[in-house]
């Protein structure tokens, strides 16, 4: 028997009959309200217990999901790290390739610079005497002028003049030999075709027995220094009769 029913009966017994008509409705209403409150509390309590039980049941599942999510997060983070490392590796590889290309270019430039410098040094060495040699050429010419001043018949008549001639000639020969040792050589183009890069034409004359445009007379001998013309030869060339 429910407590509300017992309470109703006890009240009914204790209350006088005259008062039952007015008291019973009030008591019944009160009891119904109390019963409803009790039922609502029971329902709420049972709901709380239900949710608590469900929470306890779902707690292991949630923990598993959290662990899986954390594992996924860790995997994703590792993948991000791997991707980041791959990106950095690609960048470093590209940078290393650029450095290698720069190094190869620098080595090539350095070798070219070495070759150019070597050639420049050799040129400077070869032509360092150019100005000095040009200044000496006038002295060599003077030896030639002195020798040409001697007449053959005079040399035969005077031993002293013959000895002087021989001494001057020997001095000139030694001088020219020394110049040749340092790359300075004579340019005597007699009988050669006229070359404006090596010869300087001072006059033209027709020569019946010679080919036009050839050198038939050398007015002044030219000189070269290591195959570079330092003084062109002054020449007379054969003129073409048709012109």
Swiss-Prot record:
GO terms classed as biological process: protein folding; protein import into mitochondrial matrix
**Coiled coil regions, renumbered to chain:** none
Kindly state which keywords UniProt assigns to this record, in alphabetical order.
Answer: Chaperone, Mitochondrion, Transit peptide
Ranges for region Disordered: 56-79
Q: Name one GO molecular function term.
A: adenyl-nucleotide exchange factor activity
Q: Which Gene3D superfamilies match?
A: 3.90.20.20, Head domain of nucleotide exchange factor GrpE
The record's subcellular locations are: Mitochondrion matrix
Looking up PROSITE patterns in the UniProt record yields: GRPE
Cytoplasm is among the record's keywords: no
Q: What family does the Swiss-Prot or TrEMBL record give for this protein? A: Belongs to the GrpE family.
Biological role: Essential component of the PAM complex, a complex required for the translocation of transit peptide-containing proteins from the inner membrane into the mitochondrial matrix in an ATP-dependent manner. Seems to control the nucleotide-dependent binding of SSC1 to substrate proteins.
Tell me what this protein is called: GrpE protein homolog, mitochondrial
Classification from the root reads: Eukaryota, Fungi, Dikarya, Ascomycota, Saccharomycotina
State which gene encodes it: mge1
